[in-house]
Amino acid sequence: MKKGFSLPLWVTGAAKSAVKKLTGLPFEDYELIKIPNDKNLIKIKVHSAGLIKDESHALGISFADSGLDLDVTQNLEIWTIAFLEKTYEKDNNSLDLINIIPGYGVGIDQKTSEICISKFAKEVLFENLLEILPAGYKLNLEIIFPNGKFLAERTSNQSFGIVQGLSIIGTSAETFSSASPDQLKNAKAQLEKIVSHDFYETIIFVIGENGLHLAKSSNIKFPIIKVGNWIGPLLVDAALKKIKRVILFGYHGKLIKLAGGIFHTHNHLADARIEILVYLAVKEEVPIEMIKKLSLASNVEDALLLLESSSPSLADKLWNKLSDTVEKRSSEYLKRYITTDMKVAAIIFDRQRKIRWSGDNGKDYISSFKGF
């Protein structure tokens, strides 16, 4: 598989080139990017950089190469506009020296209007830009994705309360397809590292970037691993490594598949989400007219909205049942391959990234996730 790098690195490459141009340094067609807590430097190609607005601002441009042909950010055009502002504060906190501004095509939180950017992305930007920032100045950095608003329509961003464009929520330097063997290999390596350094009785498996971002924003102290679509094999690997508890944390659109016994969750391999929901609705004796409506829903999110508009208590009952079924099916899956006492807990959030449901095992932990 072709190697690629996550969106934060390409944004940082363009930004670093713009700041250097603004401070009088010559343009280079690549930038060496530092990664927090990593000695290696990553070479990021930059398309161009130049002075604009009477030479008071600089524009840096790069094109993201995630290495993933189907990734929405592959070949994404990135603009970063840098502007230096004199500061007279002697003891400025370094966090105050860079102001990141969401420009056109960059996702913002629907409730707060703040830029949707991960902790990792901020750390990469600050790590690389603070060292080239002239003394006595602060940096205003506007990030623009010219095609971001259009491309965001192909994502589930809006379902998570992210509007106006694409979020910058990469959480590692390298990229892996969630369905590729490299993703499985990387997750197994993370699990091995966690177990070999410190013995943890409980770990958290998250499915996608939104789940990872949400989990890392909480006060949970357990190790967190992004498992992509390889949930089944990684549950077995965790049991083999004598982990006591695994908390499955994710969006209902993914975790619902586990309730149907589907443990490789990529959509091109298996979907059946509506069918699984209808099956659970029958088991819970949901009125037949509602079951008919659920079966005609175009997606799980529409089905949930339909349920909640009709009966919020019934919706909660069904989704808690789903969470409980995820836990039970996970235990049954493990027993096919290994004799183990490992507990599997399920905690599920909705499209607004609100943590809402859990199975019986997850009830012991859901309050900790909500407490942030």
Curated annotation (Swiss-Prot):
Reactions catalysed, as given in the entry: Co-precorrin-5B + S-adenosyl-L-methionine = Co-precorrin-6A + S-adenosyl-L-homocysteine
Keywords: Cobalamin biosynthesis, Methyltransferase, S-adenosyl-L-methionine, Transferase
E.C. number: 2.1.1.195
InterPro entries registered for this protein in UniProt: CbiD, CbiD_sf
One of the GO BP terms on file: anaerobic cobalamin biosynthetic process
Gene Ontology MF, one: cobalt-precorrin-5B C1-methyltransferase activity
Pathway linked to the protein: Cofactor biosynthesis; adenosylcobalamin biosynthesis; cob(II)yrinate a,c-diamide from sirohydrochlorin (anaerobic route): step 6/10
Pfam families: CbiD
Cross-referenced NCBIfam families: cbiD
Family: Belongs to the CbiD family.
Name of this chain's protein: Cobalt-precorrin-5B C(1)-methyltransferase
